[in-house]
Amino acid sequence: MSKYQIDIEINSASQQLPSEEHIRQWISTALDSQQLDEAEVSVYIVDTDEGRDLNREYRERDYATNVLSFPADIPPEVEIPLLGDLVVCAPVVEHEADEQHKPLDAHWAHMLIHGSLHLLGYDHIDNDEAETMEALETQLLARLGYADPYDEASYPEAIPTNPAPRRQASSSAGHIE
């Protein structure tokens, strides 16, 4: 039995979702990096409209983004292993993987590790924080057999993961308008 409780709810029509086993493996890899005794994380996989609604409501940004992290707000004196919730917008992850010529499973792994690290207190607001977080993401992904997601040379010959025509995206990375 795992020391982590990872609940997964899918509200997406995507036919390209990773298995629940992979989702749990990727999140557990991030949690293991912090040597936690136990943890609870909820993962909610959504489509573009819901992703946009949540991003607008909680971040005041009117577009769907790849992953939203909602750390649990539990007082320190309450001993509950709840870390928080992750919301992943499947169409955005698929679009980004295609646009960046990355294998879809590698990008899913990256987004779930990235979101999990946010739940663990990591951030990328300033350059030092970003370097620390990106280095840990790269290390964890390498442990899983994936290339450095920040090194474009890691995917020079990659075949686009989505054979469908590309969607129109704004110039900002990480979202679909």
From Swiss-Prot:
Where does the record place the region Disordered?
154-177
- Give the source species: Cellvibrio japonicus (strain Ueda107) (Pseudomonas fluorescens subsp. cellulosa)
The record lists Zn(2+) as bound by: H114, H118, H124
Question: Where is this chain primarily localised?
Answer: cytoplasm
Entry-linked PANTHER family: ENDORIBONUCLEASE YBEY, CHLOROPLASTIC
User: What protein name applies here?
Assistant: Endoribonuclease YbeY
UniProt-listed Enzyme Commission number(s): 3.1.-.-
UniProt lists the family membership as follows: Belongs to the endoribonuclease YbeY family.
Gene (UniProt): ybeY
* Keyword tags: Cytoplasm, Endonuclease, Hydrolase, Metal-binding, Nuclease, Ribosome biogenesis, rRNA processing, Zinc
